[in-house]
């Protein structure tokens, strides 16, 4: 849940309901971004489309507002005291259903400040390394573990590193599988958001001059692209260097079958097998 788009009370009630319906199967991931690609969409997500976009606030203001909302969400979930500045009487609000707790809460981030927030609140932390140097993920998770403060007895650091990965029969095949997503990234950053296209169209696409400039600036060092053994080795090395407890992969493809096949190739390379059907 991108918390700036929702009220903490709304999120608390939604996820308590989900936790009631599917006990043990729900996690609540919380992020600071709105997910919007432009100011007008961002305003529509938060204040409604009838309002002009609010003037951009500084990063510290955004961070402080998010931290307050996150603390309020945890308080509505019965996990914390309400933060200073919360509405009078907030602690008396009856959050429904009131006989089930919030599911486990994870903070998603990509910066040192997010790592510090997760550590200060004693939350599990999922750090995305998208479009970034993998060394930043290693440093971010080191900072998280170093600063971790348990909120309750038994709490301990739990770190996830989030990566983009495309696994083909070989590197050339993997690069082709990644081409629709990378094209969409370039077009979005150039101001022309577009859906994923089939591989053959992505490979044949001719970039405009502005798009070429954007593509040249993209830092794709954190992407895992290659054959099964190559990606398995890269993934294992990063997991060991970062000390991650879990790895989460994002594999956006035009064809769903390509995504499934990519996961299957990597699973076989690292020795994972599908669980037996119930």
Predicted regions span which residues?
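Conserved, mostly hydrophobic/aromatic
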Residues: 18, 118, 174, 238, ...
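Structural preference for beta-strand elements that scaffold enzyme active sites
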Residues: 25-29, 104-106, 124-126, 158-162, ...
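Active-site mouth loops of central-metabolism enzymes
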Residues: 1-9, 99-109, 219-228
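An alpha-helical appendage that flanks or caps ligand/catalytic pockets
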Residues: 49-53, 59-94, 135-242, 274-276
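Active-site beta-loop-alpha junctions enriched in small/polar residues
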Residues: 1-3, 31-35, 110, 130-132, ...
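Flexible, glycine-rich active-site loops centered on histidine and acidic residues
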Residues: 3-81, 133
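Generic C-terminus detector
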Residues: 233, 239-278
